[in-house]
């Protein structure tokens, strides 16, 4: 009985451990995606290429994610990965790294670094950085944009009393291959956003900690019940027997009380009947 209980508890521990590991991996995946370098471009979904490999070899493309809303925009670098036929028995291996392109409009991006005084912005580009030409513009509502003198991929902007919008175009051989825009908030707006933003990391850590504690407690309770199943069963049997006996005792008490009260009630009814007869 003990060996069977130990086997069940081991399987239960293994299952809960896998569930906790999956939850932590998903959380880490979200955090990694959020801090990727915005200088990487948005890239389109690549098609598998198998011209250089046998027909039974399948290739998939792994593309870096950029800071724009859609990861199929702009210009970037992708890795062509072979999923079968790799040397040394490896499940995956990189065949080559190549450049890929998607739609020119990359939407609104995020700064690569920012503080209360200044912000650093980055155009969409790939290595080497100097192979492209960059045009920065200051966007103005209902007015023509102002072309800035900066021609590098990085632009450092100081915060002003009013929010500003910037746009960067990446050109390759005088052809626009990517365009991305940024919004620079004022210091007051940034402080308000930071104050109103919930501390998701602290909440996530708290929830995970409570969940782990509850899971460990439940696991120990189940292990205790499985190992001491006979004692638990006897305890439940005694508890149910005691409850049944108490219910029977209460029923007997009620029956005895009703029997004691019934003889005193009968003479009263007889006297009432005789008085009515005499009248």
From Swiss-Prot:
Residues 30-221 are extracellular. Residues 46-58 have a biased composition (Acidic residues). GO terms for biological process: acrosome assembly. Residues 243-279 are cytoplasmic. Residues 39-74, 253-279 are annotated as: Disordered. The chain crosses the membrane at residues 222-242. The modification Phosphotyrosine is found at residue 253. Residues 1-29 form the signal peptide. The modification Phosphoserine is found at residues 262, 275. It comes from the Eukaryota. InterPro entries: SPACA1. It is found in: Cytoplasmic vesicle, Secretory vesicle, Acrosome inner membrane. N-glycosylated. GO terms for cellular component: acrosomal membrane; inner acrosomal membrane. It is a single-pass type I membrane protein. Its main location: membrane. Glycans are attached at residue 31. Keywords: Cytoplasmic vesicle, Glycoprotein, Membrane, Phosphoprotein, Signal, Transmembrane, Transmembrane helix. Interacts with CYLC1; the interaction may be relevant for proper acrosome attachment to the nuclear envelope. Plays a role in acrosome expansion and establishment of normal sperm morphology during spermatogenesis. Important for male fertility. This is Sperm acrosome membrane-associated protein 1. It comes from Bos taurus (Bovine). The lineage of its organism: Eukaryota, Metazoa, Chordata, Craniata, Vertebrata.
């Amino acid at each position: 009985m003990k060996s069977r209980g130990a086997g069940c508890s081991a399987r239960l521990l293994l299952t809960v451990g896998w569930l906790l590991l999956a939850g932590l991996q998903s959380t880490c995946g979200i955090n990694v995606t959020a801090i990727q370098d915005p200088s990487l471009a948005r890239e389109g979904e690549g098609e598998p290429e198998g011209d250089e490999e046998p027909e039974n070899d399948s290739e998939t493309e792994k593309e870096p994610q950029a800071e724009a809303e859609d990861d199929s925009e702009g210009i970037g670098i992708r890795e062509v990965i072979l999923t079968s036929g790799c040397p040394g028995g490896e499940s995956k291996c990189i065949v080559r790294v190549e450049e890929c392109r998607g739609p020119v409009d990359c939407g609104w991006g995020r700064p690569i670094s920012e503080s209360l005084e200044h912000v650093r912005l980055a155009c969409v580009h790939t290595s080497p950085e100097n192979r492209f030409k960059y045009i920065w513009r200051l966007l103005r509502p209902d007015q023509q944009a102002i072309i800035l003198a900066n021609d590098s991929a990085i632009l450092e902007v100081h915060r002003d009393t009013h929010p500003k919008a910037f746009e960067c175009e990446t050109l390759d051989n005088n052809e626009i291959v990517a365009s991305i825009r940024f919004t620079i908030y004022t210091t007051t707006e940034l402080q308000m956003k930071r104050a109103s933003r919930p501390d998701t990391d602290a909440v996530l850590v708290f929830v995970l900690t409570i969940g782990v504690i509850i899971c460990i407690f439940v696991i120990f309770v189940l292990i205790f019940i499985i190992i001491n199943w006979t004692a638990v069963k006897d305890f439940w049997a005694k508890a149910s027997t005691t409850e049944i006996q108490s219910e029977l005792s209460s029923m007997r008490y009620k029956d005895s009380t009703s029997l004691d009260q019934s003889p005193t009630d009968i003479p009263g009814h007889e006297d009432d009947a005789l008085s009515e007869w005499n009248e």
